[in-house]
Amino acid sequence: MQPAIKLRNIELGSCRPKLAVPITGTTINDILAATTPILAAQPDVVEWRIDFFKDVTNPEQLKSAGQQLRQALGDIALLTTFRTKGEGGELALSDTEYFKLCETVLDGGFTDALDVERYHDEQAVKQIVAAAHEHQVVVIMSNHDFDKTPAVAEIVKRLTSMVDYGADVAKMAVMPQSVEDVLTLLTATNIARQTLPQPVITMSMGDLGKVSRLAGEVFGSCLSFATVGAASAPGQIALENLRPELEDLKLN
């Protein structure tokens, strides 16, 4: 039985998947404006995609924006993510720049969770995980394949590697080219749920993979990404639709 991970006032890995929505504003005004419909919708988690923020490489602007966002969100959990260009994000950074950004986020004291991409310099990954834990910040370690769906064993291997590197939650997103690819992702998720000591988040992207965003309670993914406004990845479903669909599919 995987332990549930406490994230502000929710738990990841217990019962039904929690719901996250992205904020992708490019300015602080855009970011704060996005919180109005989000507060009305009340997701469990907000993912702030800082790679969209035009001042992301300015440490003081980043910390100020994060602190204002934290205040605006009230008690909704905040996950802060810089998605690199190579994994589907907006900006290409060197490893040094990437980890400096992660450190700035931690120093800002505004986030409940930090996304850490697994496939960077291994020592630097371990160091940022340790730093996050010192700040009492949950680490969601991730890998995204926008071209294909690896084999079951490879997906499980990558998720296992994330746990080995100290992830509190391991996340894998893949792109299906066939129905069989979606089944591959779901099979790997079920194996990871049964064998790993930490919760996992998985998704098969695009329209073909939408079913994976509904099936977390059955197969073992603890967080599903929905939309209130702009999507941050292909295949995300509107929160107002996804929430009742998960309710209909709940296990009694």
UniProtKB/Swiss-Prot annotation:
It catalyses: 3-dehydroquinate = 3-dehydroshikimate + H2O. Keywords: Amino-acid biosynthesis, Aromatic amino acid biosynthesis, Lyase, Schiff base. 3-dehydroquinate binds at E47, W48, R49, R83, R213, S232, Q236. Its EC number is 4.2.1.10. Pathway: Metabolic intermediate biosynthesis; chorismate biosynthesis; chorismate from D-erythrose 4-phosphate and phosphoenolpyruvate: step 3/7. Coiled coil: none annotated. One of its GO terms (biological process) is 3,4-dihydroxybenzoate biosynthetic process. It is an enzyme of class 4 (lyase). The active site is at H144, K171. Homodimer. This is 3-dehydroquinate dehydratase. It comes from Lactiplantibacillus plantarum (strain ATCC BAA-793 / NCIMB 8826 / WCFS1). The lineage of its organism: Bacteria, Bacillati, Bacillota, Bacilli, Lactobacillales.
